[in-house]
Swiss-Prot record:
Gene assigned in the entry: lpxH
Pathway involvement of the protein, from the record: Glycolipid biosynthesis; lipid IV(A) biosynthesis; lipid IV(A) from (3R)-3-hydroxytetradecanoyl-[acyl-carrier-protein] and UDP-N-acetyl-alpha-D-glucosamine: step 4/6
GO cellular component, one term: extrinsic component of plasma membrane
The protein's role, per its UniProt record: Hydrolyzes the pyrophosphate bond of UDP-2,3-diacylglucosamine to yield 2,3-diacylglucosamine 1-phosphate (lipid X) and UMP by catalyzing the attack of water at the alpha-P atom. Involved in the biosynthesis of lipid A, a phosphorylated glycolipid that anchors the lipopolysaccharide to the outer membrane of the cell.
Organism (species): Aliivibrio fischeri (strain ATCC 700601 / ES114)
UniProt EC number: 3.6.1.54
Subcellular location: Cell inner membrane
InterPro entries, A to Z: Calcineurin-like_PHP_ApaH, LpxH-like, Metallo-depent_PP-like, UDP-diacylglucosamine_Hdrlase
Annotated protein name in UniProt: UDP-2,3-diacylglucosamine hydrolase
Protein topology in the membrane: Peripheral membrane protein
Positions with a binding annotation for Mn(2+) 2: D41, N79, H114, H195
Cofactor names: Mn(2+)
GO MF term (any one): UDP-2,3-diacylglucosamine hydrolase activity
Length: 241
């Protein structure tokens, strides 16, 4: 049994190198897996399931081809693609999961998430997240003409880049106390997440129990894949061609 986890690809027409690496991964690696979990930020920005640009359609086709061949695909929304929803899933065969989802791997309960909710020291981001996740606001946004949404998102992207330059690295990382709280709340000793772009495996003690936190990498300069097989977790790099 092989299960794969990826996140933070930030797919965009402006980065064909990332897209090519992703397509190669889907067609030559994911095809041999039992399941594929995408833990958010698949896209640089997703402005709605009605955006059928040639680029978006090409990515959807990769997922559709994979699910039609029997590979189960699951998706957790990230901070860049939280508007990806039911229509995308219907068109691709992907199953949308809750922000915090507990899965079972060979009898062990494992919590999976995007990871942005763990960065509670970044107060301004958490306030922004709470606003944009309001159902009524998303309902209104999805009914704005597509070309206007594209302009809005472009402005938001520019502001995000400006703010990131002024934030310290520790603020953009997870808060350890929140990690422990969430893991205890969900009753797990293993957590897998993305968002921070810092691939690593962390072990620590909490309430006299050994906990493990696995962080997925981003795809900015190379692909990053977590493979689970024979009860072993392995983080792999995938070089761009």
């Amino acid at each position: 049994m092989t299960i794969l986890f990826i996140s933070d690809l930030h797919l965009s027409p402006l980065r064909p190198d990332i897209t090519d690496c992703f397509i190669d991964f889907m067609q030559n690696e994911a095809i041999h897996a039992e399941k594929l979990y995408v833990l958010g930020d698949l896209f640089e920005f997703w402005i709605g399931d009605d955006d059928n640009s040639p680029f978006n359609v090409s990515i959807k086709n990769e997922f559709k081809a994979l699910t039609e061949k029997g590979v189960k695909c699951y998706f957790i929304q990230g901070n860049r693609d939280f508007l990806l929803n039911k229509r995308f899933c219907k068109e691709t065969g992907v199953e949308l999961l809750d922000d915090h989802t507990v899965i079972e791997l060979d009898g062990e309960k494992v919590l999976i998430m995007h990871g942005d909710t763990l960065c509670i020291d970044d107060i301004k981001y958490q306030e922004f997240r709470a606003k944009v996740h309001k159902p009524w606001l998303q309902w209104v946004f999805n009914r704005i003409p597509l070309f206007i949404r594209q302009r809005i998102v472009k402005n938001v992207q520019d502001k995000i880049k400006e703010k990131k330059q002024t934030k310290t690295l520790c603020i953009m990382d997870v808060t350890q106390s929140e990690v422990e709280r969430v893991m205890q709340e969900e009753g797990v000793q293993r957590l897998i997440h993305g968002h921070t772009h810092r691939p690593d495996t962390h072990t620590f003690m909490s309430n006299n129990k050994e906990m493990t936190r696995i962080v997925l990498g981003d795809w900015y300069s190379q692909g990053s894949i977590l493979e689970y097989s024979d009860k072993i977790y392995s983080l792999h790099k995938k070089e761009f061609k």
